[in-house]
């Protein structure tokens, strides 16, 4: 880009100038002061490219320019003040274009600005103090402006946005006031109905308040553990009114392992399994202060646990029980039990409805023999069901299939097993003869002499030629009970030649034993 040519982008001609900003601003200010700026469709007079964009120390050398540069340069036009040229003709000067009407001037001015991209933004950047007000803009008087401080909203760059916000706030206030006035009017018009509804509301409010007070009282009440339907009421445990003397005999029992609100759990440290205590046994500490009675014994016989219960929490805290403190028993006030029968009692954890004990008959087996018998019966039922399935006898609701044995071989007979090859062919099945065939054979014309035990074949019984008398003895070997042995194409051999002639060598009497 040539430095003496104007910048084609509006407002950026100062950036591509070789002169400093200070000198450029001075030059533009002098040119701007000599020209007259107007607000509406007026441009400064004597405005040219030479005195704006061309530096003073760098004159234009037309010899260095291209041939098309002079043709591309814009026509320099010096516009006179339009106010002085209202309707008269403007004379033409040397190398200057003059116009006779304001319309031609305006049209040429627009074309001039479009071609050379020169507008008032360059002048405004050079002279920030001078303002150029467009003709379409109308300023609002200062009296009509409302400051942001008075309204109470943050300041913005645009006055129009602030005015819109103010108008919206005023509309909201008026809408709320109208709704309040409308609601007050509705209340005044429906005063009679409101009085009736207030009375009904007051009654329901009282009931709700009572219910809330009751629920609050229940929540503030001390929580109690849950109970079943038929659970017995809490028992009042008495504390033994006994005072032990300093020389009273006591024996070590164990240590406290847990302290609850109204219970103390003691674990026995006695190695002897024969020493097990039952209820009503008095326990005490090493200083012979009474703890209370044993109320429950649980756990294994070798190392049982004992529970001492109290009626209130104050009684439990009064004995100063703590975990790990040794506990003793008084031999003269101990209630021992024999643990040997307890070894043969098999307990049950089963429970009935409402967590109650079930009947002994419904509990778990207490007799080993009865338990063994029940298990054997259960196994027998399973074995029977399995055999029914393996024998191709389908159970109700089950599929008919053949089970596999341990060797992964189906339960075929021994002569049908063919391991390592293709599975055996399907066996030929034939229904056995029934007694109903007897009546069928008697009523049949073709088979009137047929035995009722014969199969009813689709083809007639085969016929045979007569036999020679010499073969009568051998006919007995062929039983008539199995007609499948005879076929129509299989006929006995004819007798030898001359067998009927007594003089022939082949003649044999029927009485002769030719088999000898």
From Swiss-Prot:
Keyword entries, A-Z: Nucleus, Phosphoprotein, Ribonucleoprotein, Ribosome biogenesis, RNA-binding, rRNA processing
Q: Does the keyword Transferase apply?
A: no
Phosphoserine PTM sites in chain numbering = 361, 366
- Where are the stretches annotated Disordered? 174-233, 413-439, 489-516
**InterPro entries found in the cross-reference section:** Gar1/Naf1_Cbf5-bd_sf (IPR038664), H/ACA_rnp_Gar1/Naf1 (IPR007504), Naf1 (IPR040309), Transl_B-barrel_sf (IPR009000)
Q: Which GO terms describe its biological process?
A: box H/ACA snoRNP assembly; pseudouridine synthesis; ribosome biogenesis; rRNA processing
Q: Which family does it belong to?
A: Belongs to the NAF1 family.
Instruction: Indicate what this protein is called per its UniProt record.
Output: H/ACA ribonucleoprotein complex non-core subunit NAF1
